UniProtKB/Swiss-Prot annotation:
GO MF annotations in UniProt: ATP binding; magnesium ion binding; phenylalanine-tRNA ligase activity; tRNA binding
Quaternary context: Tetramer of two alpha and two beta subunits.
UniProt-annotated location(s): Cytoplasm
Keyword Cell membrane carried by entry: no
Protein's GO biological process: phenylalanyl-tRNA aminoacylation
Protein name per Swiss-Prot or TrEMBL: Phenylalanine--tRNA ligase beta subunit
Species per Swiss-Prot/TrEMBL record: Aster yellows witches'-broom phytoplasma (strain AYWB)
Catalytic activity annotation: tRNA(Phe) + L-phenylalanine + ATP = L-phenylalanyl-tRNA(Phe) + AMP + diphosphate + H(+)
Length: 828
């Protein structure tokens, strides 16, 4: 299952659950008062088809296959030329007359002469009505369709689509996440009946005094739309030997019934057509019955091939427990998943799908029928983790009506007896741990008026809530003259969306009619305002543009090759319908996209490039905002001055420091060689609060050769909310009154140490008088590869006094001592 769920409401099922005939304007009522209607159309495009009975037939002269058939269609007898091989006298057939439209051949019928004989219509095969042979039995595919009517219940001349289950309309509802109760015919019928009852009550004169019924009131209309449970259906049967054990709080209720003498065969045509119109493929009579109950009552059922099952245990899955589902998909479970077992091994993934080993087979003669209530949260978590949604899991996720389980269970057993020759040998085993309840909600007329914007009549409020099956726990003869008097309400079990006062207001508003709400102009002036994060992103773009960068906007989709280049050995997100093979994986680094642009530029001899992108990188569990920029060639061209600034690692680092200064954060650099597409001697991780948030470096020669690049420099920085929501603090240092003292220090140090490490030690151990330290010379002779020469320049100043020579000498001695201690330097 994918996309936004819909529910297809079929007229023939719906009208069985309504107290009154269907309204002609059901489309408008549903759209205005219940939910969006995505489609409203006849079940079948076939028209003017009637039931006829074959009286006799005879061969047409000069034809090998054609017969002239006399057919009684109730009001008259017609003669029809037919070439079917399965004609039988006395059988009832589908007759199309002149003007009939047949969906299967997409044609309107016209009477005509065939072999010189005038034909007054056509005897129809099911395929000509648009039913695929894939879902027909071999007998139904032989020729014209012959009704099976041993009790002569189908009237001649009547609409032939009725016994086929193809008459009436279909209403396709758009189901919002909060209205799981509309995922069944009976759930929609309850809401529609409430709308119809409310429409009728609005026409009557309203009374000022209200007698609120208690929760046992008999006038709550929707309760009459639910078929009644037959308490004697299982009464005379012995107790079942099948034991049920529930070991998890995620299972509220579990019912099973053993049925024997089962005959697995195709379902009757009306049932197959009903499922097809609901978007469900028929399988066999047992599975089709469970699917019919699913769409009619919204209660998922499951049938097991009982085999040697002597016990049912509902438990949490074991860590790393593996299962194979009906569609032969393998899944690995953990202790957060719920399974149905036979006491030893799993036979179903609770609420989602059955397993292959316990599935219904053509040879099955004994089944165990299951009806249960599982925690919506547990089912939703398992479906999301396994990425496996079914029609059953959808209803468990949205919430089923626990009160309907016994009724749906009994209806399924009745259908199995009728359509599968089943024999019920034992009473059902019913195990109920707990019953879900809705919260009690208190609200008053004043709250309703403030939320809706105008006052509603108390009588209307009472009628609408009672019609919707709300229980009103309020003293009798309450007139609500005081607008602050409390109404204590409880929504029916099927309504999982009613949890707070505003949810009740939502029901009252839609029953009033959102299309009738008076428009009101908001008088309060509004002023748009950027958040600190949005401001920083906007200003960061301006900063980079002012530094000479061009902004790029690239696709979030990249090729597998570019993904591996900058995010190797990581789980990735691959889209099902890619634009092309080069656009199939969601990037985890913006550098993947920028290197492609860089390659495009260099192939066209454009080497002086500087561009950036601020966009999202996509990981399995989150999205990260990232800034990436690239440099190549000359960063600054001075033309005739001939003082160009070439792109380099240090230019790139300087730009990054400009960015970090703008953001008000301090970045540290960690030398690394882990990034295979960066030069091993010129790459570093970027750290913020000791967490790696980016990378900077020079492109590897192999990457250059592969993508036709000249020497380039790359940098990427993940912009977390912590970074973007940092308020920049400006530190002011007064202009010094006294002269600055400068000292130089030159020394040899091992090549394994960097200036950054030396600078950190100097900052940590030197008095406040040192205001700046600069590296102004680096030298390494070919003969001393293990040593390098650094020349540092120190700037000393004190705001309160003129520094004496001995003060500066003391600082220099301390600096020298610490450098010898930590790095074993040799003073030159």
């Amino acid at each position: 299952m994918q996309g936004t769920p819909t529910m297809k409401i079929i007229e023939n099922i719906l009208k069985n659950h309504l107290l009154q005939p269907l309204s002609q304007n059901i489309f408008v009522l549903t759209n205005n008062y219940i939910t969006e209607v995505q489609k409203f159309s006849p079940l079948s495009k076939n028209t003017n088809l009637v039931v006829g009975q074959i009286l006799n037939f005879q061969k047409i002269q000069d034809s090998q296959k054609l017969n002239l058939v006399e057919v009684n269609i109730g009001i008259k007898v017609v003669k029809i030329v037919c070439g079917a091989s399965n004609l039988q006298n006395g059988k009832k057939v589908i007759v199309a007359s002149e003007g009939s439209f047949l969906e299967g051949i997409n044609s309107t019928l016209k009477n005509k002469k065939i072999y010189g004989v005038f034909s007054e219509g056509m005897l129809c095969a099911l395929e000509e009505l648009g039913i695929s042979n894939k879902f027909l039995t071999p007998q139904e595919q032989e020729g014209i369709y012959l009704f099976d009517d041993p009790n002569d219940q189908i009237a001649l001349g009547s609409n032939a689509l009725i016994p086929l289950g193809m008459d009436g309309f279909i209403l396709e509802l758009g189901i919002t996440p909060n209205r799981g109760d509309l995922l069944s015919h009976i759930g929609f019928a309850k809401d529609l009946q409430a709308v119809l009852a409310s429409q009728n009550s609005n026409k009557k004169k309203e009374k000022k005094t209200i007698n609120y019924k208690t929760k046992n009131s008999k006038d709550q209309t929707n309760r009459k739309t639910t078929p009644k449970l037959n308490p004697d259906f299982f009464a005379k049967l012995p107790q079942s030997p099948l034991k049920v054990q529930i070991e998890s709080d995620s299972c509220y209720e579990y019912n099973v019934c053993i049925l024997e003498n089962i005959t697995i065969k195709p379902s009757p045509l009306w049932l197959r057509n009903t499922l097809l119109q609901s978007g469900i493929n028929p399988i066999n009579n047992v599975v089709d019955i469970t699917n019919l109950i699913l769409i009619e009552y919204g209660i998922p059922l499951h049938a097991f091939d009982s085999g040697t099952i002597q016990k049912i245990k509902v438990r949490k899955a074991f860590p790393q427990e593996t299962i194979t589902t009906l569609n032969q998909n393998d899944f690995v479970l953990d202790e957060n998943d719920l399974v149905i077992t036979d006491g030893k091994k799993a036979i179903a993934l609770a609420g989602i799908v059955g397993l292959l080993e316990s599935s219904i087979k053509p040879t099955t003669t004994k089944i165990i029928l299951e009806a249960a209530y599982f925690s919506p949260q547990t089912i939703a978590q398992t479906c999301q983790k396994l990425k496996n949604k079914t029609e059953s899991s959808l209803r468990f996720e949205r919430g089923i009506d626990q009160n309907l389980i016994p009724l749906a269970f009994q209806k399924a057993c009745q259908l199995l007896v009728t359509l599968a020759n089943a024999k019920i040998t034992y009473q059902p085993t019913i195990t109920k741990q707990k019953i879900r309840t809705n919260p009690t909600i208190s609200l008053d007329l004043d709250f309703i008026t403030r939320k809706i914007g105008f006052s509603l009549c108390p009588t209307q409020i009472k009628n609408w809530l009672l019609n919707l099956d709300y229980q009103i726990h309020t003293p009798k003869n309450l007139t609500l003259q005081n607008k602050n008097e409390q109404l204590n309400l409880q929504a029916p079990l099927r309504r999982y969306d009613v949890k707070i006062k505003e949810d009740v207001i939502s029901d009252l508003t839609r029953f009033y009619g959102c299309h009738k709400l008076p428009p009101q102009t908001i008088q309060i002036p509004t002023q748009g305002k950027l958040t600190l994060k949005q401001k920083n992103i906007r200003e960061l773009r301006k900063l980079l543009v002012n530094l000479g960068f061009y902004e790029t906007i690239t696709y979030s989709l990249i090729s597998s090759e570019m993904f591996e280049a900058f995010a190797p050995q990581k789980p990735f997100i691959k889209i099902m319908n890619p634009l092309s093979q080069d656009k199939m994986i969601l990037r985890q680094s913006l550098l993947s996209s920028l290197v492609e642009i860089l390659s495009y530029q260099h192939k066209r001899q454009t080497f002086d490039t500087a561009f950036f992108e601020i966009g999202k990188a996509y990981f399995p569990n989150q999205e990260k905002l990232s800034l990436a920029f690239v440099l190549s060639g000359n960063f600054l061209n001075t033309l005739w001055h001939k003082q160009d600034v070439s792109s380099s690692f240090f230019v790139t680092k300087g730009i990054l420091e400009k960015i970090s200064s703008f953001l008000g954060i301090t970045l540290t650099y960690q030398k690394t060689q882990k990034h295979s597409n960066f030069h091993p001697g010129m790459q570093a991780n970027l750290l913020f609060n000791n967490q790696i948030i980016g990378v900077i470096g020079k492109t590897h020669p192999q990457l250059n050769a592969k993508h036709h690049l000249k020497e380039s420099f790359l940098c990427e920085l993940f912009l977390s909310d912590e970074i973007l929501n940092t308020t920049k603090t400006l530190t002011f240092r007064p202009i010094p009154k006294f002269p600055t003292v400068i000292r130089d220090l030159s020394f040899l140090v091992d090549t394994k140490y960097s200036f950054y490490q030396i600078e950190q030690i100097i900052k940590q151990t030197t008095p406040f008088d040192l205001i700046k330290c600069e590296l102004f010379d680096v030298y390494q002779t070919p003969t001393t590869k293990e040593k390098q020469s650094f020349a540092l320049r120190f700037f000393f100043n004190n705001l309160d006094k003129n520094l004496e020579k001995q003060d500066v000498e003391h600082c220099m001695k301390k600096i020298t001592y610490n450098l010898i201690k930590h790095f074993r330097i040799e003073i030159r």
